Design a protein with these regions (language model features):
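Generic alpha-helical structural context detector
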Residues: 156, 160, 168, 172, ...
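Bacterial peptidoglycan biogenesis and beta-lactam-recognition machinery
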Residues: 116-124, 175-198, 214-245, 263-270, ...
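Bacterial N-terminal signal peptides
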Residues: 11-19
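Active-site-adjacent loops and short helices of periplasmic peptidoglycan-processing enzymes
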Residues: 26-215, 224-225
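Bacterial N-terminal signal peptides that target proteins for export
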Residues: 1-11
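Structured C-terminal helix/loop/strand segments within mature extracytoplasmic catalytic/sensor domains
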Residues: 4-6, 20-78, 86-93, 97-100, ...
Length: 330
């Protein structure tokens, strides 16, 4: 037993000696990781000068606070909200920023972004029986089985009319199924840092396991508004669409935006120009709105209200948020 103890002691001393050698300055100099050259060499970055590297999150509005500014507005009419100044990189208002929320049809922001990035906008989409089979109270683009149009046209039905039929048709075309497309949605959300979200449908009809947070939706939306096609779609008040029915005959209709700032039913505060956004409503999610606008200093603002108790209060609080927290810093 003593021999074993002695042997272990000798081995321990030897290991410590090796450890001390490995911690010496000469060895460190020879093996140290050079972020600037090694990242370029191994393809981690695409630039060979560290000053040119754009780090993830460097242009994002960042906060670790869940609630701030809620006493300055009528926040009690909603479950969560946030205001983000993209010019200054500041989150100027937060209400339950990181709390789990049901997004309803604001889900379609991610659906639209994934579709734009994953497929050719000229792809022909034919509406399936499953996509066309919606309940009477479902938000639809009034599509029938066999209707055919390009993906780009269908995206207007998704974002303006908030068509659940359009969402399913898009998902089936790109992902093979709703489940396959949801996988793409979750991959994109994770890539954007929206790690407290999980999506199971392309439309946002209630599922217990389909959720996000105000901050995660900000991360998704700020990426989406950098896409010109996405901006073009969400800023359109109404869209006259022509497409082909299952019988080969031409069909047409007009899709009007559900965003009350765009359809003329609500006005933004003086000095603000609304570009567009996405509405959403279910019993569980309440009344939701994700909005992109500019203040009088031409600074882009993202503002979000989730789980409001009615349409009137949804837009009332949104205007309060813009007026109180969307102005340029003095």
């Amino acid at each position: 037993m003593k021999c074993i103890d002695k042997l272990l002691s000798l081995l321990l001393v030897a290991c410590l000696g090796l450890g001390l050698v490995s911690c010496g300055s000469e060895s460190t100099d020879q093996t140290s990781y050079d972020l600037e050259t090694t990242s370029y060499q191994y393809g981690i970055t695409k630039v060979n000068n560290i000053s040119d590297v754009s780090f993830y999150g460097s242009n994002l509005c960042v906060t670790d606070q869940d609630n701030f500014g809620i006493d300055q507005v009528d926040s009690q009419v909603a479950g969560a909200g946030g205001v983000f100044n993209l010019a200054t990189g500041q989150c100027t208002y937060g209400q339950n920023l990181f709390g789990k929320m049901y997004p309803a049809s604001t889900t379609k922001i991610l659906t639209c972004l994934v579709a734009i990035e994953q497929a050719d906008l000229d792809t022909q989409v034919t509406v399936s029986a499953h996509a066309a089979d919606q309940t009477a109270d479902s938000s639809v683009a009034n599509l029938a089985e066999g209707d055919a149009m390009t993906l780009k046209v269908l995206l207007y039905g998704l974002m303006l009319r908030s068509g659940n039929d359009a969402a399913i048709a898009i998902a089936e075309t790109i992902g093979g199924s709703e489940e396959g497309f949801a996988k793409l949605m979750n991959e994109k959300a994770a890539a954007l840092g929206a790690t407290h979200s999980h999506f199971v449908t392309p439309h946002g009809l209630h599922e217990d396991d389909h959720y996000t947070t105000v901050y995660d939706m900000y991360l998704i939306f700020q990426a989406a508004v950098q896409n010109e096609t996405f901006l073009q779609i969400i800023s359109t008040p109404s869209y006259d669409v022509s497409y082909t029915g299952a019988d080969g005959q031409a069909k047409s209709q007009t899709w009007v935006s559900t965003n009350r700032y765009l359809n003329g039913k609500e006005s933004a505060p003086a000095g603000f120009t609304v570009v567009g956004g996405k509405t959403g409503t279910t019993y569980e999610a309440g009344y939701c709105l994700v909005l992109y606008s500019y203040n009088d200093q031409n600074q882009p603002i993202i503002s979000i209200v989730y789980n409001s108790d009615c349409t009137l209060n949804l837009y009332y609080l949104m205007n309060e948020l813009l007026y109180t927290f969307g102005e340029a810093p003095s």
